Amino acid sequence: VGSEMCIRDRYEALYLDRLLITQAPAIALGNAKKELVHLASYAIQSLEASYAFFAKGDEKYYDKVEKYETAVNSIDEELTTYLIDISNESLSVSENEVLASVLDSVRDLERIGDLAVASANLSQHIHNKGIEFSDTAKAELADVYNRTHRIALDSIRVVVDDDKVLAGQVILRHEELKKLEKQLRKTHTKRLNNGECTAQAGINYVDYLSHYTRIADHAINLVEKVTEGVI
């Protein structure tokens, strides 16, 4: 997850065998969970490319974000349809719980992809307008990104391995990130008041903070499904 993948012109699901829906819905549900991880790999790569575009300003990273977003949307649509079709079959109570959780998780991953795109669009605006961040602001955003990225990667590991120990660690790191965000908003307001950064850069800084922390929030939703034993 999260490593550079070959970007094809056409994106499609890998694990959604439609014959299994009626013949073996429980196995189809297991395949849907595998597809969820495939979807996650594109959402996280979109996040990585989005940050690279912010940090380096090279348009090739913006193009990657757009391609990964195409993949996320395509797989999201296919996987959602697959899950809805499975829900029409006879499933046990626990299988129905898992199905609902996978469906929720698809939405969370789709939102992570959307927020990565929003960050890339923000970066494009900043590069086009020549808006500059201070070195301190850049270092703070790099820290928030790295924490968010690690939470996102580990959230998928938690799902794949059903790792409740790692889940607990990730939840603690998410709490730390929320505290850091509050602290950064305060120190940033002081910078603005002291005239150390422009109002426009100030607004954009807060937007980045918001995008990254919301991505972490969506990743944590997946982790909590594991701690609740419903995925």
Region spans (language model):
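Cytosolic, long alpha-helical scaffolding segments
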Residues: 1-3, 8-231
